[in-house]
Design a protein with these regions (language model features):
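"…together with the soluble PPM/PP2C metallo-phosphatase catalytic core" -> "…together
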Residues: 2-203
Length: 203
C-alpha cells in the first residue's frame, strides 16, 4: 500500500513538473528570455533560457509533499537558483553571485552539522572548493543534454548508493532526478531550451 502511495505521489509530482516546465517556456517566449550563441556555444540558433528552473520547482515540490526536512539545504539551493536565474535575465555583478554562493555553502555546512568555526580553515577550503565545483557547470554549454546527462550520471548512482547506505531521504533524490529527466526531454531536442545558469549553479 505504501509503495502504491509513493508511486502515485511520484506521478503527481512528475505531472506538475512537466506542466510547470511547459508554462515556463511560454513565459520565457513571451518575455524574450533567450540565449544568443557565442563562440563558446555548441548551438548556433537563438534558444530559450532558464529551463533549469524546473530543478528549483522540484526542490519546492519535495518540501511540499514530504516535509521541510532539510531547511538550510533547500534555502541555499533556492538562493543559488534565484541568483542564477537573474543572471539569465539581467546582468549581475560577479561579486554578488559569489556572496550568494558562499552564503549557500555555509547553509549547506550548517545542514549537515559541519559549521563549526573552530575549524574555520576547513570551512574556508570547503566553501572555495564547493563554489568552484558549482561554477565548473557554468562552463558547460547547457544545450544538447550535456549538463543534464552528466547530472543524471551522478544522481542515479546516488539513488543506488542511498539504498545500501541511507544518507538522505530517497524521495529528494528521486524528485530531483525526475526534474532532470523532464529537462533532458526538452534539452536533448535541439533548439527548444538551453539550461544555462539556473540549473548549472543550483546543481
Amino acid at each position: 500500500m505504501e509503495k502504491m502511495e509513493n508511486m502515485l505521489s511520484y506521478g503527481i509530482i512528475f505531472a506538475i513538473l512537466l506542466v510547470a516546465e511547459l508554462l515556463y517556456f511560454k513565459v520565457a517566449d513571451k518575455y524574450n528570455i533567450i540565449d544568443k550563441p557565442n563562440l563558446r556555444s555548441s548551438h548556433t540558433q537563438i534558444t530559450l533560457l532558464g529551463g533549469g528552473i524546473i530543478f528549483i520547482f522540484g526542490a519546492i515540490l519535495y518540501a511540499a509533499f514530504y516535509g521541510f526536512r532539510y531547511p538550510w539545504f533547500l534555502l541555499g539551493l533556492l538562493m543559488i537558483g534565484a541568483v542564477s536565474f537573474l543572471v539569465d535575465v539581467k546582468t549581475v555583478r560577479p561579486r554578488y553571485r559569489l556572496i550568494v554562493h558562499f552564503a549557500a555553502m555555509l547553509l549547506l555546512f550548517q545542514q549537515w552539522g559541519y559549521l563549526d568555526f573552530r575549524y574555520w580553515w576547513f570551512i574556508a577550503v570547503g566553501i572555495v572548493f564547493c563554489t568552484g565545483v558549482i561554477n565548473v557547470y557554468n562552463f558547460m554549454d547547457g544545450i544538447n543534454g550535456i549538463t543534464g546527462g552528466y547530472s543524471l550520471s551522478v544522481l542515479i548512482p546516488l539513488i543506488l548508493l542511498n539504498e545500501e547506505s541511507h544518507f538522505i531521504d530517497k524521495n529528494l533524490l528521486i524528485v530531483l532526478t525526475m526534474s532532470v529527466v523532464i529537462f533532458c526531454f526538452f534539452n536533448f531536442r535541439k533548439k527548444r531550451d538551453v539550461l544555462r545558469a539556473t540549473w548549472e549553479r543550483s546543481r
